[in-house]
Amino acid sequence: MKFTNLTAKEFSDFTDRMTYSHFTQMEGNYELKVAEGTESHLVGIKNNDNEVIAACLLTAVPVMKIFKYFYSNRGPVIDYNNKELVHFFFNELSKYVKKYNCLYLRVDPYLPYQYLNHEGEITGNAGHDWIFDELESLGYKHEGFHKGFDPVLQIRYHSVLNLANKSANDVLKNMDGLRKRNTKKVKKNGVKVRFLSEEELPIFRSFMEDTSETKDFADREDSFYYNRFKHYKDRVLVPLAYINFDEYIEELNNERNVLNKDYNKALKDIEKRPENKKAHNKKENLEQQLDANQQKINEAKNLKQEHGNELPISAGFFIINPFEVVYYAGGTSNRYRHFAGSYAVQWKMINYAIEHGINRYNFYGISGDFSEDAEDAGVVKFKKGYDADVIEYVGDFIKPINKPMYNIYRTLKKLKK
């Protein structure tokens, strides 16, 4: 075995074959970092047949003017069941970064620690407890089992829907009542989904602005999304949910015709048997449905007059690799939330994953606080409703490479606080 630099193709070919390969460890992210001017390294291990058997993207930024801080975001991509390989990689990684005047190194492996449900109850251990002792023996210090959202540390909890051996109908059956109703509702409401082009990204950004204001969270800058759309290429999809009013109004009119037939039948039943309580109840129920239907028709006609035939209502930002579809961000028009556009977006992308043989649909980060007072309690409830599971990852590890200077660096940081 040898630790070596990799070409972009070697790196990409390997990471695309591996499970637990995060989108930050793919060629598109390497191209993005290079374009941003970030010092970037592709490194890995090759066996005696010159085959890549481990890989990671490393970035380096200046620290204290003369040193560098190295970071592997969700790396390395490696078979963690091969403990000998893991030991060799992390040992050689320290030697590699030392050659580049590294002050300290941070890694946060995309490695599950344990599995939970959305009540926070542990449902299983991932079998990777040994990694803590292994990395400690190599000089890496674990940063703790943090919860919540941190500007430096990667989120430790993901909400993940397993799609292995499931059809779209299986997924629908396993949803809770609200998710099931809203997923069916968007079909009736004439909500369609298409993918946005780069020129149309401002539509997505406007929805994110709406959502961040309503839910009071800090969104990323426009450049974050635009740059990833550009460099990740076909690994990014931005589905837009919209209403086609011609089709929607036609569906509502068809529904009205059916309701009118049923209503006339109920009237005839009452004529024949005025004492028929069931027919009277049916008549009242149909009158309510007809009234609701007419309100929808009126609303649709007014909105069509205001916006034209198509009205965008929701959009999401998804990052895809062969291992998983990641729901990174999403936003909805506050004014048209009642059309449930976000459910159309999710349903479209769940079907995309199934159709492309991708077994993992990642709703992405949650805080790890499962109480009703959690800052993301509503988000947790939404993701739970799709019958997703929670994966807790092992967390961050730091290794000082130049220990004396790292201690000085930490002291200076404390003094600045």
From Swiss-Prot:
Main location, first listed in the record: cytoplasm
Keyword Cytoplasm included in the entry's annotation: yes
GO BP: any one term: peptidoglycan biosynthetic process
Catalysed reactions, semicolon-separated: beta-D-GlcNAc-(1->4)-Mur2Ac(oyl-L-Ala-D-isoglutaminyl-L-Lys-(N(6)-Gly)-D-Ala-D-Ala)-di-trans,octa-cis-undecaprenyl diphosphate + 2 glycyl-tRNA(Gly) = MurNAc-L-Ala-D-isoglutaminyl-L-Lys-(N(6)-tri-Gly)-D-Ala-D-Ala-diphospho-di-trans,octa-cis-undecaprenyl-GlcNAc + 2 tRNA(Gly) + 2 H(+)
Entry GO MF terms: aminoacyltransferase activity; nucleotide binding
EC number of this enzyme: 2.3.2.17
InterPro entries hit by this protein: Acyl_CoA_acyltransferase (IPR016181), FEMABX (IPR003447), PG_Glycine_Bridge_Synth (IPR050644), tRNA-bd_arm (IPR010978)
Transmembrane segments: none
Keyword Ribonucleoprotein applies: no
Enzyme class: transferase
Keywords on record: Acyltransferase, Cell shape, Cell wall biogenesis/degradation, Cytoplasm, Peptidoglycan synthesis, Transferase
One of the record's GO cellular component terms: cytoplasm
Pfam families: FemAB
Localisation per UniProt entry: Cytoplasm
Family: Belongs to the FemABX family.
Function: Catalyzes the incorporation of amino acid(s) into the interchain peptide bridge of peptidoglycan, using aminoacyl-tRNA as amino acid donor.
Record-given protein name: Aminoacyltransferase FemA
